[in-house]
UniProtKB/Swiss-Prot annotation:
Disulfide bonds: none
The protein's name in its UniProt record: Uncharacterized RNA pseudouridine synthase jhp_0321
Keywords associated with the record: Isomerase
Lineage: Bacteria, Pseudomonadati, Campylobacterota, Epsilonproteobacteria, Campylobacterales
Single GO MF descriptor: RNA binding
Swiss-Prot/TrEMBL catalytic activity: a uridine in RNA = a pseudouridine in RNA
Active site, per annotation: 119
InterPro entries: PsdUridine_synth_cat_dom_sf, PsdUridine_synth_RluA-like_CS, PsdUridine_synth_RsuA/RluA, RluA_PseudoU_synthase
Keyword Isomerase: yes
Main EC class the enzyme belongs to: isomerase
Length: 293
């Protein structure tokens, strides 16, 4: 795990903000971000940024692991990373789990950021700008729908022909608090379209391998759309299941014990500064046991 916890002994009274700055050799703004995320503790108590400290403290910080390479393509202004399943694209609250942002910034520096995101459960390609400006320009491509994204998924049941799923998606606000991340098919939702193409079928497991092209970018769109046509993705615990099962799945996710979702962002195709790019990621090893011999 690239987040490490290290102990330091402070011999004379020192402001917490300055300590973090000096230890991590970062700016005051970056040091403040670490303190806001409650990463400095003394006697198991969170240290505030204005606090004067002395004695033994413990600091949690990201230490890049050079052996854990995920960069699959690099250009002058951006890179493309292959995110594993069950890793966040961005840091999540006060948690110290690895995120893809950590990997991106270990390669390109602190001004590098993802231009879009993948769900925690989904693996595959993520485009990242090397600077704030390039990230802004790349985000504009996604907003203007100038990036073609394709996914691979393993889904329950036989899909023997192409499907266009055109169902509006609503992200509700006034629902059970513990299930608030779940989107819904609703006439009040935003237009959402997903193209589904069958690639193969394993009759022994009753599982189809699908190529999926989302034409819109709603939260959990592919997962919700496939569940809505009775082809739930293998490993899906949030959609197409009863509320109690969804709650159990979310608890397992918090404990890092949730089943792996069989959804992979397989390719990105776009034009940027006069050049055409098509970047592909191979099918994940976790898919192989489900495929027909």
């Amino acid at each position: 795990m690239p987040f490490v916890e290290e102990e330091f002994e402070i011999l004379k009274p020192t402001k917490a903000l300055f300590l973090v700055r000096d230890v991590l050799k970062c700016s005051l703004k970056e040091a403040q971000r670490h303190l806001d995320k409650q990463r400095l503790k003394q006697n198991q108590q969170t240290v505030r940024k204005s606090q004067i400290i002395q004695g033994v403290v413990r600091l949690i910080y990201f230490k890049p692991n050079e052996k854990q390479e995920k960069l699959v393509f690099e250009a002058k202004d951006f890179g493309v990373f292959d995110k594993p399943a069950q890793i966040y694209t961005h840091p999540k609250g006060y948690f110290y789990h690895e995120s893809l942002l950590d990997c991106i910034q270990s390669h390109f520096g602190k001004n590098a950021h993802p231009a879009h995101r993948l769900d925690y459960e989904t693996s595959g390609l993520v485009l990242a700008g090397k600077t704030l400006q390039s990230t802004k320009d790349l985000k504009a491509l996604f907003m203007q729908k100038k990036v073609k994204k394709t996914y691979l998924a393993l889904a329950h049941g036989l899909v023997d022909k192409s499907i266009i799923i055109n169902k509006p998606i609503l992200t509700p606000q006034n629902i059970q608090k513990d299930l608030r991340i779940r989107s819904q098919i609703s006439p009040l939702g935003k237009p959402s379209i997903t193209l589904v193409e069958p690639l193969s079928y394993n009759p022994f497991l009753d599982i189809s391998l699908l190529k999926i092209t989302p034409l819109t970018g709603r939260t959990h769109q592919i997962r919700l759309h496939l569940s809505s046509v009775d082809h739930r993705i293998v490993g899906e615990g949030l959609y197409g299941v009863a509320d109690e099962n969804a709650r159990e799945y979310l608890q397992l996710k918090r404990e890092n014990n949730a089943p792996t979702l069989m959804l992979h962002a397989a390719s990105l195709e776009f034009e940027f500064k006069g050049a055409h790019y098509k970047i592909a990621s191979p099918m994940p090893e976790r898919f192989m046991p489900f495929l027909k011999d």
